[in-house]
Amino acid sequence: MSLIKIDQKAYEYNLRHIAKKIGSFQRLICVFKDNAYGHGAKLLAPLAKNLGVSFVAVKSEEEAQEIEEFFENILILSHRPHGNENSRFIYALNDISQVKKYKQDIKIHLKIDTGMHRNGICVENLEHAIDLIRSSDLKLTGMFTHFASADEMDGSFFVQKENFQKAKKIVKKYFSNLLFHSHNSAALFRGKIPEDEYCRVGLVQFGYGDSNLKKVLSLYAHRLSQRILQKGQSIGYGGIFTAAKDMEVATYDLGYADGLFRYNGKGELVLGNGKVMLGKMSMDSFSCENSGEEICVFKDADIWADFFHTINYEILVKLNPNIQRVLV
């Protein structure tokens, strides 16, 4: 069966490196949404906890329930209120119209739209939002925003930072001891994080976004069969690849049903061991030169992202949660 190996030492190294940058593990919010970006939330949760992480963020209540035994604080980022929220969790308030839809006495973090224009309340409407929250039974415990272009060298990042500072100044007139967080993975290494803020880290905790970090995930497949592909013979659907000489090939147990982008046989898709995929990828398998019982498909998602003209996030989060994940 195909296998995902999670490098425990690399993950712990990354968290220590990030915590040093932030100042402490206590100011660190690990984002574990979408199965920890494909890495395996339940597998990584105890590692983060043992290092001192007490706050994580996830997408949904279902994701929160999977790891609630490990963390004191869990923020749910993409919740649609239904009136039966769990007091164990913290919920992001993404739209002011949601205030009356939440269960009473639920803890919330108010999302501020500082310029991304995706979710949140704009700074101009913050006073009105505060009035509604204060007249409700919700417990405002934090406020946050998300930077749209922290990884790009333009002025929008600084505009958003300034807008969030304005929002903090307003909300502090009405509430004390709120938890603020604005810096994400891309913003982490772009200067000093404000002393009154936590930092949300997503893909950076898994080794992407900074050259000083170590990749955590590697994907492996196992051999299903092997054969001699004779000169002039083709392999796979459509016969895209034809052998120029006799060669020993093998088929491995990983395909596009496992969450991989479908290789169409055009161009050279280099695998983790330096071999190239031969012919079109099938639903549950692919072929290449025989590489033994186990083959590394990739150790760095950037290589596949570049080949398929996408981002490393998409390569990783698509990995099927049914693929076994193990610590190494």
Curated annotation (Swiss-Prot):
The keyword Transport does not apply. SMART domains: Ala_racemase_C (SM01005). The modification N6-(pyridoxal phosphate)lysine is found at residue 33. Its cofactor is pyridoxal 5'-phosphate. One of its GO terms (molecular function) is alanine racemase activity. One of its GO terms (biological process) is D-alanine biosynthetic process. The active site is at residues 33, 237. It comes from the Bacteria. Pathway: Amino-acid biosynthesis; D-alanine biosynthesis; D-alanine from L-alanine: step 1/1. Substrate binds at residues 118, 283. One of its GO terms (cellular component) is cytosol. It holds the Pfam family Ala_racemase_C. The keyword Isomerase applies. It catalyses: L-alanine = D-alanine. Disulfide bonds: none annotated. Its EC number is 5.1.1.1. Catalyzes the interconversion of L-alanine and D-alanine. May also act on other amino acids. Belongs to the alanine racemase family. PANTHER family: ALANINE RACEMASE, ALANINE RACEMASE, CATABOLIC-RELATED. NCBIfam families: alr, PRK00053.2-2. This is Alanine racemase. It comes from Campylobacter jejuni subsp. jejuni serotype O:23/36 (strain 81-176).
